[in-house]
């Protein structure tokens, strides 16, 4: 009898439904890498060899994401209002920050970021969908291809010992 119950409980439909459960992404994540896959299949580092970043997601899906190239040079003047054009360029291209809400579609393996504020103003009040993969405490996703065909890929590791 127990075998029959187990068989009925784990039909393909039930297993498929279980696999579509929304994963719990709430918590703090640190950036493992922020790479870019070029159209020819080669891979590069989008934010330098040792990027740093933090992704925080609360239980309601509000998030804040920060990525920085750790090799960004300091401003010679020590004043962000008087930087040179080259200093401003490396600052903008060496960082990415946005916040808002996110939603997970487990069946489509997609995360939708509803961006409320961003270091790149063109992203504000937009929605961006990224294909994701969650393996234990490792979250990775692919950003839609840029105009030149490059595909940014980010991987995050959940910070241990969170409540």
Say what each PLM segment does.
Residues 1-3:
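Bacterial N-terminal signal peptides that target proteins for export
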Residues 7-163:
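Lipid interaction determinants
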């Amino acid at each position: 009898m127990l075998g029959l119950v187990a068989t009925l409980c784990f039909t393909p439909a039930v297993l498929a439904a279980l696999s579509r459960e929304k994963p719990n992404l709430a918590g703090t994540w640190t950036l493992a890498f922020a790479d870019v896959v070029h159209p020819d299949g080669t891979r590069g580092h989008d934010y330098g060899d040792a990027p740093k970043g933090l992704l925080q997601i609360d239980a309601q899906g509000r998030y804040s994401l920060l990525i920085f190239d750790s090799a960004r040079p300091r401003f010679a003047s020590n004043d962000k209002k008087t930087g040179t054009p080259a200093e401003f360029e490396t600052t903008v291209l060496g960082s990415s920050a946005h916040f808002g809400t996110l939603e997970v579609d487990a069946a489509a393996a997609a995360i939708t970021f509803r961006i409320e504020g961003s270091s790149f103003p063109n992203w504000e009040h937009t929605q961006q969908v990224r294909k994701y993969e969650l393996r234990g405490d490792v979250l990775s996703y692919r950003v839609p291809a840029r105009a030149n065909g490059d595909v940014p890929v980010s991987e995050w590791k959940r910070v241990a010992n969170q409540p």
